[in-house]
Amino acid sequence: SCHDLLEIMLETCPEGMFIPAHIWTPHFSMFGALSGFDRAEECFGELTPYIHAVETGLSSDPPMNWQLSALDRFQLISNSDAHSPAKLGREANLLSGDLSYYGLKQAVETGEGLDGTIEFFPEEGKYHFAGHRKCHICLSPAEAEAQGGICPVCQKRLTMGVSHRIAQLADRP
């Protein structure tokens, strides 16, 4: 489990950083529609205070994440996947502190020296909207709700997108 993985990391390397990545990816990420977690505390339990940052993923940006007051205690970072050279650097973090492991750790833990993120367009993310890849369907949260979460082409369940999941959990505009 996520809790157990964090516990192992803390036992093995107390100076380590544990940053949940791609927190909104629909299937099995921390806040994915199928994860079973609506809050970090549900995922990490009593170890939640050791989580200082979350990585937002390509399909969301900081303003989308700011809709959840439950994320206020975390630094928001944005990293690029390294699946191909063309995708490197699409997202990045702006750092002004000491460029060392401990400087990065301080920025992640306190926000000092973490000056923001460089973001790609969330709409370009594979999971921004709800959809069904096989049928080439991509729907906004309102459209997905109107369809009852069902693909209008094949009648199978849609994969609910990041924007839909954030709307479900948001407690402010």
Each predicted region: which residue ranges?
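Internal, well-ordered alpha/beta segment that forms a basic, Gly-enriched binding/recognition surface
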Residues: 10, 14
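Short beta-strand/loop segments at the ligand-binding rim of alpha/beta enzyme cores
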Residues: 17
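Phosphate-interacting basic helix/loop segments used at nucleotide- and nucleic-acid interfaces
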Residues: 2-8
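Short, well-ordered beta-to-alpha junction loops that form the rim of enzyme active sites
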Residues: 20-24
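Charged catalytic cores and adjacent phosphate/nucleic-acid-binding surfaces used
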Residues: 7, 26-173
